[in-house]
């Protein structure tokens, strides 16, 4: 409101629950309620998701909470290059952006372009092109989807397209629809519980737009509808992995 572009941090995205009134009722709605006279170009970075053994209150994936609030933009990078590019785009955006960083990806290494690097919000990234099935993934699920795609090709002769959704609001429906139409099959992979996850939204869009082009049902790979455990064995069973993705695709292909 004073011309600055603050970048705030919430260490664990679970704690959005503590400040949700401010985020959902004030920050998200100010531009609309002032007829565009007041902009809030705020970026809130937050550690999101499981896999780090932090337990039920520090491991939730809450990006689907934010998707339902008009006025908020929502992104979740999976690579070091996209962290730089999406963060730059988020800071330049006139609207508030929730920037979710999957905690288990903090140690990821990869090439990062030098100098200015901006990745447009609302643009998905097709990481791998295939002919038999399209897999949509986000954040930690992206490398797992890529691993699954390699296994599917090498061991089962199934060619998979992998899309890094990376921007949930705005959502790149054009790329998702185009790539799904090419293969006729869609699998979404996410850390959210099955009920009301972002995969359900993508599934509904694809069903509405491409129903007669699909060669099978849309399959969602998710966590179960239970709190994530701090136990290694239990958390590993809950969060989707490459093997579960392979099984889901094989079932669809059969």
Feature map (PLM): residue ranges:
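Conserved thiamine diphosphate
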Residues: 1-144, 160
């Amino acid at each position: 409101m004073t011309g600055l572009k603050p970048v705030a941090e919430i260490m664990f995205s679970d704690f959005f629950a503590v400040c949700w009134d401010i985020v959902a009722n004030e920050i998200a709605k100010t531009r609309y309620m002032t007829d565009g006279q007041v902009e809030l170009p705020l970026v809130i970075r937050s550690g999101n998701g499981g896999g780090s053994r932090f337990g039920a209150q520090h491991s939730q994936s809450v990006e689907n909470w934010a998707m339902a609030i008009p006025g908020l933009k929502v992104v979740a990078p999976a690579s070091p290059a996209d962290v730089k590019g999406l963060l730059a785009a988020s800071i330049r955006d006139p609207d508030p952006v929730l920037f979710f960083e999957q905690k288990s990806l903090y140690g990821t290494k990869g090439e990062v372009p030098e100098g200015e690097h901006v990745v447009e919000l609302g643009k998905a990234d097709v990481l791998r092109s295939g002919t038999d099935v399209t897999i949509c993934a986000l954040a930690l699920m992206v490398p797992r989807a890529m691993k699954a795609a390699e296994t599917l090709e090498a061991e089962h002769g199934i060619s998979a397209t992998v899309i890094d959704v990376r921007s949930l609001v705005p959502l790149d429906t054009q790329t998702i629809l185009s790539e799904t139409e090419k293969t006729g099959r869609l699998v979404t992979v996410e850390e959210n519980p099955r009920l009301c996850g972002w995969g359900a939204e993508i599934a509904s869009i694809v069903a509405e737009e491409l129903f007669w082009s699909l060669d099978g049902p849309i399959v969602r790979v998710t966590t179960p509808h239970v709190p994530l455990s701090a136990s290694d064995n239990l958390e590993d069973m809950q969060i989707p992995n490459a093997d579960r993705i392979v099984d889901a695709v094989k079932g669809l292909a059969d």
